Each structure stands twice: as structure tokens, then as C-alpha cells.
Amino acid sequence: MDTQMARAPLAVRAVLFDLDNTLVDLMGMKRVASDAAARAMLAAGADFPFSADEAGDILFGEYLPDLESDSVFEAFLRKHHRRALGMGQHQVDRITAAAVNAYLRAKMLRTEPYAGVRPTLVALTKAGLRLGVVTDAPRFKAYQRLEAAGLPDFFEFVLTFTDSGERKPAERPFRAALDLLGLPPHQVLMVGDRATQDMAGAKALGLRTAWARYGSPGAPVPLEAEAVLERVEDLIRLIPLAADRR
């Protein structure tokens, strides 16, 4: 934990977690799965003007603007296939299906919590802290990731974009979480990897904030972060784990 921040423990009664790149390594999973999908496209007959390794890198880059996209594979195929204009829909569907299948297989194998997440959640739960998730992911995809990582039972609730209709840093997702907890903002800690969406959004409503540096390596420390987590286990030292919280 950053020794220049949060010198005093944060006395809170609940912890809200972002999901992607905070609890699970979404970017790592997407990179591995994109590589698998690109190789499957080539094996199914795609003709790209670059190598398999380059195809995976390019596909991952085209995923970044919308990590929840369901159409990226067909769009990638039509954009980069040497004879895209001559492809019939059967060929498009076959190659795209191969990509989706390979992507899903890799996704299931690679969707896992960061090291230390489970023991940290166990320690926080045993201490009586209430835990929730506030994510911009759609509900179904959020639960896919949580289930694959074996984490959903740790949380009292999972608030998604499907539920709130707005993405962080809008107030609505955070207010919805506070309403479910029935706690004032200063008794709730928000943990996330994004400066604007997680840290600034939570701080604007008076929540306490801890930035997951491990989920955004190389990014500058957000001004709104009260603490910096080098790894998720730093939460155990950051929050007084009093036995009488319940």
C-alpha cells in the first residue's frame, strides 16, 4: 500500500468493488482470448495480410473501444480479410463461429480472480464488512465473470449497467448501492482501477476511495484516491477488521 496515503486506517462498514481489472483480470483474459479467436479464424479459412500473432494483437486492439461488443469478430473479419467482398454469409458465419467458440473456451480458462482476492474477501466477510459490486458491465456478462472466477457468493448485491442504466462516474450506480446498504457514504469504501469512473465518481458522493493500481499498471495515481492498493490484500491492512462490526 502506498505509504504516502491513508496513514490512518479507513473505518468503514462496507466495501464496494468494481469488477473488471479490480476483482478479475479482464484485460489479461481479453488478450489471451483474442489471440485464440484470431488463430481460429485463420484455421477456419480467413485470409489476413498479417501473421497469427499480429492478428491476435490487432483484434485485441479493436476490442478496446468496446470491451462488451458482441460483433467484433465479424467486423474484424470483414475489415481485414483479403477477399472480403467475395465472402458469402455462410463463409462469414463459419469463420465467425470458429472465432466465438475459441474465444469462449479461452475466456472460461482465463477468467480468474487476481491473486489474493479470495482470501481478502474471506477476511473482510469474517470481519463483518458488507460487500457489493458496482460495475459498468451488463448483468449477464458480469455474472459470467463472477461465476467463472468463483466469487458471486461473497457479495450482498451486484449492481450492473443493466440495473442502473447509467455508467460510472454517474451518481445513479453509487446511489443505488448506498440505498441497498442503508449506510452514509463516509462508511462505504469504493475499490476500483479507473480514475474517473471509480475514484472521482465515488468521491463526488462522499464515499471513501482506494485505487487498485494492480489493475491499471503505469497509470498515474488519481487525485481522488485516498489509498493506493499495490495488491488486493492491502485492503486487510487498510481497514480495521474489528470483530464487532455485526
Regions found by a protein language model. Name each.
Residues 1-15, 28, 43-44, 87, ...:
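Asp-based, Mg2+/Mn2+-dependent phosphohydrolase catalytic module
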Residues 7-115, 140:
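N-terminal helical cap/lid subdomain that shapes the substrate entry/recognition surface
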